[in-house]
């Protein structure tokens, strides 16, 4: 009887140890490797839709660099924003006649094709209002939403973001399940 109790206690301890290890690993993964986020709003439409869930790669924040064109989750004061990095530290960003210029060079934005077409159908002669040039300071990033007519971003209220304020890069949509896809 005594050996049966010892065996049960040993089994319970083994299970408890396995559960603790699993919880610690889950917390480490969630806080330092990748995390789920909910897209709130239409500022990235049609690339991302309102209420979609994305996985965010957080490792780039610690062991890499962000690239122009990355879709990122930003930590705001009370909310998270999902935007696209347009300008890197040291860049000069300008929009003229619906054409993006970085450091004086034209930049192609193929992800805006559907929105540009829709803007013209809606009677607008351009998708993105002219702005700039804006010099992006060191340690800051200039971001914009893909739905330029319906996005608060670095142009109009959110300002520039530091690397510390960027949670990570969105790599794919995982929900709704029937619309899983890469985001970049």
From Swiss-Prot:
Q: Which reaction does it catalyse?
A: Cleavage of hydrophobic, N-terminal signal or leader sequences from secreted and periplasmic proteins
Q: Does the keyword Protease apply?
A: yes
The residues exposed to the Extracellular compartment are: 40-184
Q: Which SUPFAM superfamilies match?
A: LexA/Signal peptidase
Q: Cellular component terms, GO, for this chain's entry?
A: plasma membrane
Domain of life per record: Bacteria
Summarizing the annotation, the consequence of altering residue 48 to A is: Reduced activity
Transmembrane listed as a keyword:
yes
What effect is documented for mutating residue 74 to A? Reduced activity
Record's keyword terms, sorted: Cell membrane, Hydrolase, Membrane, Protease, Transmembrane, Transmembrane helix
Q: Which GO terms describe its biological process?
A: signal peptide processing
The entry's active site is: 43, 83
Induction annotation: Expressed at the postexponential growth phase; regulated by the DegS-DegU system.
Variant or mutagenesis effect after changing residue 83 to A/H/R:
Loss of activity
Any idea where this protein resides? Cell membrane
Q: Which Enzyme Commission number(s) are on file for it?
A: 3.4.21.89
**Functional note:** Not essential for cell viability, but required for efficient secretion of many proteins.
Entry's family note: Belongs to the peptidase S26 family.
The entry's other comment says: B.subtilis contains five chromosomal type I signal peptidases: SipS, SipT, SipU, SipV and SipW. They have different, but overlapping, substrate specificities and have different transcription patterns.
Which NCBIfam families would you find in this protein's record?
A: sigpep_I_bact (TIGR02227)
- State the protein's name: Signal peptidase I S
Give the species.
Answer: Bacillus subtilis (strain 168)
């Amino acid at each position: 009887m005594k050996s049966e109790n010892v065996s049960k206690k040993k089994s319970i301890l083994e299970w408890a140890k396995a559960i603790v290890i699993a919880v610690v690993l889950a917390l480490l993964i969630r806080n330092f490797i990748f995390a789920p986020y909910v897209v709130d709003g239409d500022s990235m439409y049609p690339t991302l839709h309102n209420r979609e869930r994305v996985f965010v790669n957080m490792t780039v924040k610690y062991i890499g660099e962000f690239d122009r064109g990355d879709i990122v989750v930003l930590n705001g004061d009370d909310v998270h924003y999902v935007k696209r990095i347009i300008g890197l530290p040291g860049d000069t960003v300008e929009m003229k006649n619906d054409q993006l210029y970085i450091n004086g060079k034209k930049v192609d934005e193929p992800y805006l094709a559907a929105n540009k077409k829709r803007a013209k159908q809606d009677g607008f002669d351009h998708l993105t209002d002219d702005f700039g040039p804006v010099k992006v300071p060191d340690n800051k990033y200039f971001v914009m939403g893909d739905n330029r007519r319906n996005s608060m971003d670095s142009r109009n209220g959110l300002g520039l973001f530091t690397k510390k304020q960027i949670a990570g890069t969105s790599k794919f949509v995982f929900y709704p399940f029937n619309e899983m896809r890469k985001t970049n």
